[in-house]
């Protein structure tokens, strides 16, 4: 079954589909978003900023997207950045210019999203470097995401809508930057140069900044096909993730409604993207981590290095209790399983199917997950073992063509999670995706 022949409606009822990461990010969301955005009218982002990243290949050309939705690469697609985002405008403009063409005419920015300034990035670096010296680093991308959300919730941040009236924006800007320079003892900061740049951004973007809530609801009323692109992933959610080793936004399904302003009843289908093994960038608990040659094998074969930071990712076995916890939050309808090909060549594959208390020996209740930073001190993973396979599976065209042991592994994941696996990624290229009937 060729996935390119199928519309998003072939995998669920309704026109509004969300693609959400179900682990610690880097699950490979970009590929399925890219595939489905060809068939959608509108592609949206609702959270985060340039700390996220997708690398998409179209017509043998690679595009690194950090702020723009994947749909921007298709002429029939309108793209929306929602109010839940923090936007580093220079990075956005650079991304627009790197793609070329008149793509800005297909882009709308929420007037309620917040502007991320260079000073936010300066503060982020200062804070992370201080934590590093104390041995308490979070492992942020130093893109200024946390400090920008901090000014937002402190009610001193500047919304993108302010940029439509430059004189008003200028007064807000000077007040904010002066306050932050004093608060963080920053003496070397070129406000005049940044203001000059923002005047050009004002001229370029003033007609692209709109009331996204009204726009989105009009599109919903017109029954447009809407693809919602989640940045980061569930276990990095500010509330539900492995706090404090998380991002600063709501990365789970609730962020869609608060970050785009659409009615929760309008979402028809939630796709949970799940990597066939587990990875994590930066610090924080990782109870199935492999610090041996198998972990190195997964990292090198899967090229597990950050799209945004190029940092090596920590690798480990797939964690079923994590997926059940995320399913409780996101109500995952179907699963896109990615990078199954990376497991080829392993003699044995472990699948974490539970956690046992080190103190009592009792198994953790289904749907619960130990997210506290000291969780590894109190729980140990329970594994089920699977025989591996040697074959290269990247040329398989159907689920039935996969090696028997690969099929057994996939079916076990499906059984434990209780949501159907619809797509399986078996290689790096866009067409290395099979549909499981």
Swiss-Prot record:
SMART domains according to UniProt: Adenylsucc_synt
Similarity comment: Belongs to the adenylosuccinate synthetase family.
HAMAP family noted in UniProt: Adenylosucc_synth
Subunit structure and binding partners: Homodimer.
Location of the protein in the cell: Cytoplasm
GO CC, alphabetical: cytoplasm
Name of the protein this chain belongs to: Adenylosuccinate synthetase
Chain residues that bind substrate: 307-313
Active site (record annotation): 26, 54
PANTHER family listed in its UniProt record: ADENYLOSUCCINATE SYNTHETASE
Residues engaged in binding Mg(2+): 26, 53
Miscellaneous notes: Parasitic protozoa lack the de novo purine biosynthesis pathway and rely exclusively on the salvage pathway for their purine nucleotide requirements.
Reactions catalysed, as given in the entry: IMP + L-aspartate + GTP = N(6)-(1,2-dicarboxyethyl)-AMP + GDP + phosphate + 2 H(+)
Binding site residues for GTP: 25-31, 53-55, 62, 307, 313, 339-341, 425-427
Organism annotation: Plasmodium vivax (strain Salvador I)
Pfam family, one: Adenylsucc_synt
Lineage: Eukaryota, Sar, Alveolata, Apicomplexa, Aconoidasida
Protein's UniProt keywords contain Transmembrane helix: no
Cofactor(s) it depends on: Mg(2+)
Ligase found in the keyword field: yes
Record note on cofactor: Binds 1 Mg(2+) ion per subunit.
Biological function: Plays an important role in the salvage pathway for purine nucleotide biosynthesis. Catalyzes the first committed step in the biosynthesis of AMP from IMP.
């Amino acid at each position: 079954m060729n996935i390119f022949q199928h519309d998003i409606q072939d995998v669920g009822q309704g026109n509004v589909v969300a693609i959400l990461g179900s682990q610690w990010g880097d699950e490979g969301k970009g590929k399925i978003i890219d595939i489905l955005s060809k068939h959608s009218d509108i592609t949206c982002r609702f959270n985060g900023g340039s700390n996220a990243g997708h690398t998409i290949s179209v017509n043998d050309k690679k595009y690194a997207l950090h702020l723009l939705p994947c749909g921007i690469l298709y002429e029939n697609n309108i793209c929306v950045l929602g109010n839940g985002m923090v936007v580093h405008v220079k990075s956005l403009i650079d991304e627009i210019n790197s793609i070329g063409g008149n793509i800005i005419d297909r882009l709308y920015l929420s007037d309620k999203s917040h502007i991320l300034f260079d000073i936010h990035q300066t503060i982020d670096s200062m804070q992370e470097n201080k934590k590093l010296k104390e041995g308490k680093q979070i492992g942020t991308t130093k893109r200024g995401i946390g400090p920008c959300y901090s000014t937002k919730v402190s009610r001193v941040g500047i919304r993108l809508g302010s940029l439509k009236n430059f004189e008003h924006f200028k007064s807000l800007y000077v007040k904010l930057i002066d306050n932050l320079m004093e608060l963080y003892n920053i003496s070397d900061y070129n406000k005049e140069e940044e203001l000059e740049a923002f005047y050009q951004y004002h001229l370029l973007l003033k007609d692209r900044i709109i009331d996204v809530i009204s726009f989105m609801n009009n599109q919903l009323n017109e029954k447009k096909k809407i693809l919602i692109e989640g940045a980061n992933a569930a276990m990095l959610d500010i509330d539900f993730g492995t706090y404090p080793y998380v991002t600063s936004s709501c990365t789970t399904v609730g962020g869609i409604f608060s970050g785009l302003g659409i009615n929760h009843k309008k979402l028809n289908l939630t796709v949970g993207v799940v990597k066939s093994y587990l990875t994590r960038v930066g610090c924080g608990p990782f109870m199935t981590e492999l610090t041996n040659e198998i972990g190195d094998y997964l990292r090198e074969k899967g090229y597990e290095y950050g799209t945004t930071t190029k940092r090596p990712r920590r690798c480990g076995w797939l964690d079923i209790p994590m997926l059940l916890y995320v399913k409780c939050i996101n109500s995952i309808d179907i699963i896109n399983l990615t990078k199954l090909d990376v497991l080829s060549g392993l003699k044995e594959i472990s699948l974490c199917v539970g956690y046992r208390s080190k103190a009592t020996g009792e198994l953790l209740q289904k749907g619960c997950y130990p997210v506290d930073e000291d969780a590894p001190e109190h729980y140990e993973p329970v594994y089920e073992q699977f025989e591996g396979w040697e074959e290269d599976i990247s040329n398989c065209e159907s689920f039935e063509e996969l090696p028997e042991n690969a099929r057994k592994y996939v079916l076990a994941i499906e059984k434990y999670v209780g949501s159907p696996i619809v797509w399986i990624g078996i290689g790096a290229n866009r067409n290395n995706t099979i549909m499981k009937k």
